[in-house]
Swiss-Prot record:
Catalytic reactions on record: ATP + protein L-histidine = ADP + protein N-phospho-L-histidine
Subcellular location per the Swiss-Prot or TrEMBL entry: Cell membrane
Organism encoding this protein: Staphylococcus aureus (strain NCTC 8325 / PS 47)
Listed GO MF terms: ATP binding; phosphorelay sensor kinase activity
Membrane topology type: Multi-pass membrane protein
Protein name: Sensor protein kinase HptS
Cysteines paired by S-S bonds: none
Mutant phenotype after disruption: Deletion leads to impaired growth when the available carbon source is limited to glucose-6-phosphate. Deletion also alters antibiotic susceptibility.
Stored Pfam families: HATPase_c (PF02518), His_kinase (PF06580)
Domain Histidine kinase, residue spans: 297-513
EC number: 2.7.13.3
CC terms in the record's Gene Ontology section: plasma membrane
Positions of transmembrane segments: 20-40, 222-242
Modified residues (Phosphohistidine): H325
Length: 518
């Protein structure tokens, strides 16, 4: 007996599979989905902020360039050695700086002159060099450098979304940072874990704006939540195990009793009827087990008898398929032909090998009718070599009938019987007519042989129902028994014959069960 797990164990496992684990799985999926959506939203936000910041910086740069272009002629008329012209220059540059949406500082340097709005003396080395311009004045050419300390947009992003900004050059040197974790002038090394970032090119000098966010705190919160969920799951498993085991023991006591009775019934030791302790619908199963046990005992004896008969029929099938007399006669014919007609002998050997391959094929007990007819034609061809072409075979069949499936060797015994018992010294004509009607294949095998007398015909008809060991007419008897096993009582085999007028065999094969191997 196979060692199965008790039903209460399966019930307990089913409780986990159907309640606890799905709930936990939903929570896990929800948590993962939340984090996936969170990451997606953050990426979208960073992308949006990068675009907005890039647009803002480009706009500021464009305004500065436009201002410089428009006032270029005015600057050429000013002389920075003149106090009034210096004041005018400062006023114009401050006007430029104050119009921009950013905190900017300028430095105008030239021969013996330095002008700036960096009154607090901030270190411009920690600022981003926004742009550089050459301005021609009346007395000389000066260099204008504009530094960016911050922009309102980057400050808002840092304050509202905790997203920080960097500006790096083409060698990843940090030119600007609003995060204390980075120092201007150092190399920028992207963090491999816990950071989301996106960058965009700012100008032709390959300066890049990088906006990033630190999500370490979010990841740590997620890990903490997972630990809490794991602890809750362990508690649920322990509680569910104890509860399910107690409930399963109460609910499955009668089921275990029934399983024990099934085991006894399987080993044919059930004994007399005993009711279950609890009056429930399981009593119906208990009654059915005893009724089924009694029915099985009756069927077992019948099946054992049927199996013995099937084995006997299979043995006879093997004996008939090998056809020792036919093989012996054919081998003698081949021996005779080797000296007279080697080519014809080779043809006979090929036909015989094809017949043996067909009859000994064991992968399926069903074949197409067309294969069976080819086998019959080869069989008759070999017999004609022995009997000097005295056997004429005619097959009348539609193309549809030829593609129907029947049991293997279901027609050949009819032809074998016609040749063996119908032939005399004259030629023998055998006609096979195949028709389809109402899901049945009707086979008519007619010959013009010597036929049978009434008494002989009666004897042959009775032999069809005899045991395979109790008759010498193995071919028809075996065919009839095989058809009854494979097709049931729907198969019919009728024999009609008159002395010196030939024999007619009518054979009906149901097609609805023809595809089932036996």
């Amino acid at each position: 007996m196979t060692a199965y797990k008790p039903y209460r164990h399966q019930l307990r496992r089913s409780l986990f599979a159907s309640t606890i684990f799905p709930v936990f799985l939903v929570i896990i999926i929800g948590l993962v989905s939340f984090y996936a959506i969170y990451i997606w939203i953050e990426h979208r936000t960073i992308h949006q902020h990068v675009d907005e910041s890039q647009s803002s910086l480009h706009h500021t740069e464009k305004q500065i360039q436009t201002f410089i272009t428009q006032h270029n002629n005015s600057f050429q008329e000013l002389d920075l050695t003149n106090h009034h012209d210096v004041t005018a220059t400062k006023r114009e540059l401050l006007k430029l700086i104050h119009q921009q949406p950013a905190t900017l500082y300028y430095e105008l340097s030239g021969p013996n002159q330095f002008i700036t709005n960096n009154y607090e003396h901030l270190n411009t080395k920690n600022m981003y060099l926004f742009s550089t311009h050459q301005l021609k004045f009346k007395n000389s050419t000066y260099m204008l450098k504009i530094y960016m300390a911050n922009t309102p947009r980057l400050s808002e992003i840092k304050k509202d979304n905790r997203q920080f900004a960097l500006i790096v050059d083409q060698y990843d040197n940090i030119l600007y940072a609003n995060d204390d974790r980075f120092t201007i002038g150092e190399k920028y090394r992207p963090q491999q874990f816990g950071f989301m970032n996106e960058s965009v090119k700012l100008n032709h000098a390959d300066h890049r704006l990088i906006i990033y966010k630190d999500i370490h705190e979010n990841i740590e919160d997620g890990i903490t939540l997972l630990i809490v969920m794991a602890v809750v799951l362990v508690l649920l498993v322990i509680f569910g195990f104890i509860s399910a085991d107690n409930m399963a023991k109460r609910q499955t006591k009668d089921i275990e009793t029934i399983i024990q009775k099934i085991y006894y019934a399987k080993n044919r030791h059930l004994g007399t009827y005993t009711p279950l302790k609890n009056n429930s619908e399981l009593e119906e199963i208990n009654n059915y087990i005893y009724d089924l046990f009694e029915s099985n005992e009756q069927l077992i004896h019948s099946i054992e008898h049927t199996e013995r008969r099937l084995r006997d029929i299979q043995l006879k099938e093997i004996e008939r398929q090998f056809q020792p007399h036919f093989l012996f006669n054919t081998m003698q014919t081949i021996q005779y032909l080797i000296t007279l007609s080697p080519k014809l002998a080779q043809t006979v050997v090929q036909q015989l090998s094809q017949m043996l391959r067909y009859s000994l094929r064991t992968n399926s007990h069903t074949v197409e009718l067309n294969e069976e007819l080819n086998y019959i034609e080869q069989y008759v061809a070999i017999q004609n070599i022995r009997f000097d072409d005295m056997i004429k075979l005619h097959i009348e069949s539609s193309e549809e009938a030829r593609h129907q499936t029947i049991g293997k060797m279901m027609l050949q015994p009819l032809i074998e019987n016609a040749i063996k018992h119908g032939r005399d010294t004259e030629s023998l004509d055998i006609t096979i007519r195949l028709t389809l009607a109402r899901q049945n294949l009707h086979v008519l095998v007619c010959d013009n042989g010597i036929g049978m007398s009434s008494s002989r015909l009666q004897y042959v008809r009775q032999s069809l129902n005899n045991d395979v060991f109790d008759t010498k007419h193995l071919g028809l008897n075996h065919l009839h028994n095989k058809a009854m096993i494979q097709y049931g009582s729907h198969a019919r085999l009728h024999i009609f014959s008159k002395r010196n007028q030939g024999t007619l065999i009518c054979y009906k094969i149901p097609l609805s069960r023809g595809n089932v191997d036996v």
